[in-house]
Amino acid sequence: MAAEKLRRGEDLTLEEAHDAASGMLGGMGTDESAELLSLLARKGETDEELLGVLEAVSEHSERVVPRNSGTVIDVCGTGGDGMSTLNVSTACAFVAAASGCTVAKHGNRSSSGCSGSADIFERLGCDLDQRPGDAASLLEDLNICFMYAPRYHPALAGIADARKKVGGRTVFNLVGPLCNPAGVRDQLVGVSSQDLLGRIPRILHRRGAGSAMAVMSDDGMDELSTSSHGSACILRGGEVYTERVDPEALGLHASSANELRIHSAGGAFHSFVAVLDGRAGRAMAETVELNAAAALVVGGISEGLADGIEAARVAIEGGAASDLLDRFVAKAGDPGMLREARE
């Protein structure tokens, strides 16, 4: 039925999209799944369809149950900007956590750049196959944990062939960053298209988020950047609105995208550590501060970006971010690998 409607160019209801996605995740054949994904992508997915697929993916996922009180947030990007820049979201997660946020970080390996969140955590010596209870304990003890997407969404492996057959972006690329295994709804999401900028906060609101923000830079980065002006679509108090972001008006220094570019996985890892240690160049440090500020706004720690930038800078320059990285690696990684990155 879903395929018939899509062939006619008709939108699916939330329930129809949910049932179609559940079928794909439950063992539907590769050809049938690929046709559904292609038809959805060709038509363009509605919010109802995204919500239906999102609910189905969440139902097929393994869960982490946070024991923390208060708001838990996630910081992630949709990826695909193709700019091979510093892994901002991972550094931002540590800075935000060191500034008072509780961050249940969900992520994967890089799809288009040199290094994704999972690549960074792997280089820290972390076990990407970590049990949900261990992730919850880290979150409780340190206010930060990492959940490797393939570990928590095993059903997605069953549609890998169908996604390859489609050959391009599918609905699962869009909903993946929103399927946090810890049930997090309040998120900072970096996007690389104007269409998603306005839609993601609305979708998260319908999923129960009280606060959320989607951000992008005018130069195409799927995060805020000091290399250009940017936009933030914000959910606050039940309202969704968009603001322009001028880094220089916030007291930051203009940079170029080249100053944020990374050329290897090793370079991405060393830059990540350097930012948290307060040793990175100004462009990288301030870009992370800007995005951490957005995370602090989502988490209710800071009222606005200016306050958040100051809090993030204190966390980096005062050593709290570096100390949190040390404690995280001591509990969940290999301190020797971190020492090597600092040599």
Curated annotation (Swiss-Prot):
What does the entry list as the binding residues for Mg(2+) 2? D222, E223
Q: Which pathway does UniProt place it in?
A: Amino-acid biosynthesis; L-tryptophan biosynthesis; L-tryptophan from chorismate: step 2/5
Q: Which residues bind anthranilate 1?
A: G77, N108
What keywords sit in the KW lines?
Answer: Amino-acid biosynthesis, Aromatic amino acid biosynthesis, Glycosyltransferase, Magnesium, Metal-binding, Transferase, Tryptophan biosynthesis
Q: Where does Mg(2+) 1 bind?
A: S89, E223
What does the record give under GO molecular function?
A: anthranilate phosphoribosyltransferase activity; magnesium ion binding
Any single Gene Ontology cellular-component annotation: cytosol
One Pfam family recorded for the sequence: Glycos_transf_3
Q: Which InterPro entries match?
A: Anthranilate_Pribosyl_Tfrase, Glycosyl_Trfase_fam3, Glycosyl_Trfase_fam3_N_dom, Glycosyl_Trfase_fam3_N_dom_sf, Nuc_phospho_transferase
Can the keyword Secreted be found in this entry's annotation?
no
Cofactor names from the entry are: Mg(2+)
Q: Which residues bind anthranilate 2?
A: R163
Q: Which reaction does it catalyse?
A: N-(5-phospho-beta-D-ribosyl)anthranilate + diphosphate = 5-phospho-alpha-D-ribose 1-diphosphate + anthranilate
Q: What is its EC number?
A: 2.4.2.18
Cofactor, free-text remark: Binds 2 magnesium ions per monomer.
- Its EC top class is transferase
What family does the Swiss-Prot or TrEMBL record give for this protein? Belongs to the anthranilate phosphoribosyltransferase family.
Subunit structure as annotated in this protein's UniProt entry: Homodimer.
Q: What does this protein do?
A: Catalyzes the transfer of the phosphoribosyl group of 5-phosphorylribose-1-pyrophosphate (PRPP) to anthranilate to yield N-(5'-phosphoribosyl)-anthranilate (PRA).
Name the record gives this protein: Anthranilate phosphoribosyltransferase
Name the source organism: Cenarchaeum symbiosum (strain A)
Tell me the name of the encoding gene.
trpD
